[in-house]
Amino acid sequence: MSGERRKVRAVFGVAHIFASFNDTFVHVTDLSGKETSLVLTGGMKVKADRDEASPYAAMLAAQDVAQRCKELGITALHINVRATGGNKTKTPGPGAQSLRALARSGMRIGRIEDVTPIPTDSTRRKGGRRGRRL
């Protein structure tokens, strides 16, 4: 009997991680994406405005998300990572580290997908003809 393992069905949710350079949102929904379970941001976890987008704030938010998911009965997550996109940056900000915290906190990870909006033909980017001068 000790060699037998029971299969435990994983209850999946979807974690939408929006990592911009100003803040990080971790938004958990059901599989269809219609029903929101919970939303947490980096700004809810730290006091200083400059720390909202930091990896530390994102990891605190993700740990809290994992704990609340377990209370709701969600044991596994598919993850959608999103950057600002459009005619702005297509690389996720430092808050994408929240993914690592979700994995460490005991949540099973299903699929990881990049859902950054990428334009097929975009409007002109701000900054002028000669670009932003520092």
Swiss-Prot record:
Pfam family, any one: Ribosomal_S11
GO MF annotation, one: structural constituent of ribosome
Record's keyword annotation contains Nuclease: no
Skewed-composition ranges (Basic residues): 125-134
One cellular component term from this protein's GO annotations in UniProt: ribonucleoprotein complex
Highest taxon above the source species: Eukaryota
Keywords: Ribonucleoprotein, Ribosomal protein
GO biological process, one term: translation
Family: Belongs to the universal ribosomal protein uS11 family.
Record protein name field: Small ribosomal subunit protein uS11
Organism per entry: Syntrichia ruralis
